[in-house]
């Protein structure tokens, strides 16, 4: 006999969990659509050569790669952005530019499984393709803020940086292995200052003095400074080189745009340690953390990539986007007790006391559905205890009971499972009025 078990880093979703996830995805999808983003889908499985060029060395170690039955070198996608590059290169003639897309799907990384981190997880990506305007970068941050607020989250911060600032810092210190250095810096939260110092020595050959000065710059954060105060503080860096000058100027322009959008200033701050480990980022980058749950890591991250299609097409297309980590958000929202704990989406359970009442019960259920009330019929004529126990377990808000009197008079008795209040022999319209009083959960 086979022992039923799930691989480490993967998980089953019970009905309650699946309902919670579906509700969150529905909310963020509405936000995406409200900004004009349209949905696309790409395969879970791609040619390995499609995915590998833009994967960092750490990500390459985590990719699920194998030979298929046709002896083709294939891999499971590790994010939704690289498949987007392939998709846009293949279809850009019919898409029209600029192109705003969102995609929701599972991705796979063989990283160490831990709280809030899985080897299969869902990403919700939204991207603005075909424009280099910073208006697009500002809109992506606007969508991040709107999406988290749609999930009833208010206490979060979007940490913002620019890859040109990081490139400029590396240039200032004469670091030639820029991508490798930034990949290590991106692990600052995971491995700490000592870990970063050791890896920079080992992988990039830097000495202790250079690393100390490098980390002093990279740890510059806005913190509680106003936008004006912070830009005044870092103005001297513009004189170091063109990369630093351009990066800071872009951030100044971005902040102007975010101010025009009237996004609360406490929701975004500059943090020079934000690097984003993926090699395709070229401009503004950001990571979003929940202020009360920073140990969970970033719940939404992304940035600008101005060479999106370089591996697939001679025509270069710029892009900027972000990815919401819905699985991490579920962990956070669960701990905050902000999730629906029901195991059903039906608001009403209809219970029959006798077999011959089912035809009436089914008509009643259909009438409720046509009125926008999700309903189900308990499939067995039982003593009333069993369907009530079922309703308690599933989380139905109401149980409608059809007994002899209700059947003859074409009424129903209704019990509110939260308050315990029961009303007998109600007309359909009266029952509908009572049930519909709290229909925001539908």
From Swiss-Prot:
**According to its record, what are the GO cellular component terms?**
cytoplasm
Listed InterPro entries: aa-tRNA-synth_II (IPR006195), aa-tRNA-synth_II/BPL/LPL (IPR045864), Anticodon-bd (IPR004154), Anticodon-bd_dom_sf (IPR036621), His-tRNA-ligase (IPR015807), HisRS-like_core (IPR041715), HisRS/HisZ (IPR004516), HisRS_anticodon (IPR033656)
Classification via PROSITE patterns: AA_TRNA_LIGASE_II (PS50862)
**Molecular function GO labels:** ATP binding; histidine-tRNA ligase activity
Q: Which reaction does it catalyse?
A: tRNA(His) + L-histidine + ATP = L-histidyl-tRNA(His) + AMP + diphosphate + H(+)
Top enzyme category: ligase
Its keywords, alphabetically, are: Aminoacyl-tRNA synthetase, ATP-binding, Cytoplasm, Ligase, Nucleotide-binding, Protein biosynthesis
Q: Which CDD domains match?
A: HisRS-like_core, HisRS_anticodon
Q: Where is the signal peptide?
A: none
Q: What is its main location?
A: cytoplasm
Q: Where is the protein found, in the record's own terms?
A: Cytoplasm
Under Gene3D superfamilies, the record lists:
Anticodon-binding domain, Bira Bifunctional Protein, Domain 2
Q: What is its EC number?
A: 6.1.1.21
Any one of the GO BP annotations: histidyl-tRNA aminoacylation
Q: Name one Pfam family in it.
A: HGTP_anticodon
Record's subunit section: Homodimer.
Q: Which HAMAP family match?
A: His_tRNA_synth
Q: According to its UniProt record, which protein family does this protein belong to?
A: Belongs to the class-II aminoacyl-tRNA synthetase family.
In Swiss-Prot or TrEMBL terms, this protein is called Histidine--tRNA ligase
List the lineage, top down.
Bacteria, Pseudomonadati, Campylobacterota, Epsilonproteobacteria, Campylobacterales
């Amino acid at each position: 006999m086979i022992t039923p078990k799930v691989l480490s880093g993967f998980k089953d979703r019970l009905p309650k969990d699946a309902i919670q996830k579906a509700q969150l995805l529905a909310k963020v999808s509405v936000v995406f659509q409200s900004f004009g983003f349209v949905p696309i889908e790409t395969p879970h499985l791609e040619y390995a050569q499609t995915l590998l060029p833009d994967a960092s060395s750490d990500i390459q170690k985590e990719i699920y790669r194998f030979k298929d039955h046709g002896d083709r070198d294939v891999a499971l996608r590790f994010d939704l952005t690289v498949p987007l590059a392939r998709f846009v290169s293949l279809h850009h003639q019919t898409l029209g530019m600029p192109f705003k897309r969102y995609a929701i799907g599972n991705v796979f990384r063989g990283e160490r499984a831990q709280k809030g981190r899985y080897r299969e997880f869902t990403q919700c990506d939204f991207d603005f393709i075909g424009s280099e305007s910073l208006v697009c970068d500002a809109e992506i941050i606007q969508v991040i803020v709107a999406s988290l607020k749609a999930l009833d989250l208010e206490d979060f911060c979007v940490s913002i940086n620019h890859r040109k600032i990081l490139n400029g810092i590396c240039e200032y210190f004469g670091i030639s292995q820029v991508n490798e250095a930034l990949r290590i810096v991106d692990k600052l939260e995971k491995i700490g200052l000592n870990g970063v110092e050791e890896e920079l020595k080992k992988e990039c050959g830097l000495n202790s003095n250079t690393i100390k000065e490098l980390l002093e710059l990279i740890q510059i954060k806005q913190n509680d400074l106003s936008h004006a105060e912070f830009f005044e503080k870092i103005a001297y860096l513009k004189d170091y080189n063109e990369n630093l000058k351009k990066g800071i100027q872009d951030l100044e322009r971005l902040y102007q745009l975010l101010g025009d959008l009237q996004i609360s200033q406490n929701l975004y701050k500059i943090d020079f340690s934000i690097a984003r480990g993926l090699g395709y980022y070229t401009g503004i980058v950001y990571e979003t953390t929940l202020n009360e749950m920073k140990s969970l890591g970033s719940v939404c991250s992304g940035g600008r990539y101005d060479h999106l299609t370089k591996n697939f097409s001679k025509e270069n297309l710029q892009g900027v986007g972000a990815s919401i980590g819905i699985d991490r958000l579920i962990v956070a929202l669960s701990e905050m007790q902000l999730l629906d704990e029901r195991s059903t989406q039906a608001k009403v359970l209809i219970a029959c006391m006798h077999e011959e009442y089912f035809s009436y019960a089914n008509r009643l259920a259909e009438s409720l559905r046509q009125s926008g009330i999700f309903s189900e019929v308990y499939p067995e004529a039982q003593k009333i205890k069993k369907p009530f126990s079922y309703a308690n377990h599933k989380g139905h808000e109401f149980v409608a009971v059809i007994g002899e009197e209700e059947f003859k008079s074409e009424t129903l008795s209704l019990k509110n499972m939260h308050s315990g209040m029961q009303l007998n022999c109600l007309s359909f319209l009266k029952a509908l009025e009572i049930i519909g009083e709290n229909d925001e959960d539908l």
